[in-house]
């Protein structure tokens, strides 16, 4: 069985779109776990109604389970961890309540994962204007590659449930939670983020699915939406957490990649006209390549992460 864990907070206006996509999911057995995070609108009632619908619907091709949990601790990560604690599936994946789930995603990913710990893939984002973009992804990404390209996003993988529990679940971050989570997912390293983390550090077995899945909706109040300067304080907190709490487990190359990524984000803030906010985002190092990346992005240059990745792979500009 695969458990699909979905945090929900005040999403009554997007839930029917989500439910419509979940009704088309072909894989069985599947367990949908909605974790209400203190909604003040009708979200929890709508989730419970959908769960009742699933219970009443006969399933000709295997078990279909759905449950609504309540998580009093605020934050999507707390809700995901509550769902992870509850999950009964051998495998699990995570999703957001304002997006659309691909019907054959679980069937295809379950085939691809084989005996691996994690199966990665790519997802599709959709803007409010209707523009579509395929997120970065390729087989067997390195930690430093994820730091620059963000190969792991919330919806871009399935994994063994015991493995996700062992690496500590989700860290309590206000933004870019999947950026930090992806480091541990790819490496098998963990911090004692939660009680019960018992995994010895090891490299996980990774599988790859070549498909492009889901419709991830970007908007101002989504987890992934908004401008850089509006999220500057939260992004800065996420970077500091990664630098001091997570990257201490990795080699110097990972720290260099993080510095490049911070420089790129600083450039985006400058491009948006917010130079003071960019200065507040500490690089932690003075480096010519970082400065060049920042200036390039501030001038609205594109593909800076690819340039930075080339520097990393050539191993010419580290230190």
Write out the residue ranges for each language-model feature:
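Short, acidic, metal-binding catalytic loop of nucleotide-sugar glycosyltransferases
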Residues: 20-29
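A conserved acidic beta->alpha catalytic loop
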Residues: 21, 36-46, 96, 102
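Flexible acidic/His/Gly-enriched loops in nucleotide-sugar-dependent glycosyltransferase catalytic domains
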Residues: 63-65, 73, 105-163, 167, ...
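Short aromatic/hydrophobic "clamp" motif used to bind/position activated sugar donors
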Residues: 92
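Conserved nucleotide-sugar donor-binding catalytic segment
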Residues: 141-234
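Catalytic core of nucleotide-sugar-dependent glycosyltransferases
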Residues: 210-220, 225-253, 275-286
């Amino acid at each position: 069985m695969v458990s699909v864990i979905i945090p929900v907070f005040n999403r009554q206006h997007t839930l029917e779109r989500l439910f419509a996509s979940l009704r088309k999911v072909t894989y069985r057995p599947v367990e949908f776990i909605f974790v209400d995070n203190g909604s003040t609108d009708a979200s929890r009632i709508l989730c419970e109604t959908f769960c009742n619908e699933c219970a009443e619907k006969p399933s000709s091709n295997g078990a279909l389970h759905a449950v609504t949990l309540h998580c009093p601790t605020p934050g999507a990560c707390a809700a995901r961890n509550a769902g992870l604690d509850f999950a009964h599936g051998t495998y699990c994946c995570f999703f957001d309540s304002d997006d659309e789930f691909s019907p054959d995603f679980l069937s295809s990913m379950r085939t691809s994962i084989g005996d691996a710990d994690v199966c990665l893939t790519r997802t599709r984002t959709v803007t409010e204007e209707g523009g579509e973009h395929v997120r970065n992804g390729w087989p067997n990404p390195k930690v430093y590659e994820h730091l620059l390209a963000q190969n792991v996003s919330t919806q871009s993988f399935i994994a063994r449930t015991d493995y996700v529990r062992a690496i500590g679940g989700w860290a309590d971050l206000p933004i870019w939670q999947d950026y930090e989570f992806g480091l541990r997912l790819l490496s098998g390293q963990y911090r004692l983020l939660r009680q019960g983390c018992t995994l010895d550090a090891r490299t996980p077995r990774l599988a790859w699915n070549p498909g492009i899945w889901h419709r991830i909706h970007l908007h101002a109040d989504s987890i992934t939406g908004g401008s850089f300067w509006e999220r500057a304080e939260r992004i800065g907190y996420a970077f500091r957490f990664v630098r001091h709490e997570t990257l201490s487990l990795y080699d110097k190359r990972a720290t260099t990649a993080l510095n490049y990524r911070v420089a790129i984000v600083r450039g985006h803030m400058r491009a948006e006209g917010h130079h003071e906010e960019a200065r507040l985002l500490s690089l932690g190092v003075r480096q010519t390549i970082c400065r060049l990346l920042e200036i390039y992005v501030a001038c609205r240059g594109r593909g800076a992460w690819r340039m930075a990745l080339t520097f990393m792979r050539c191993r010419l500009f580290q230190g």
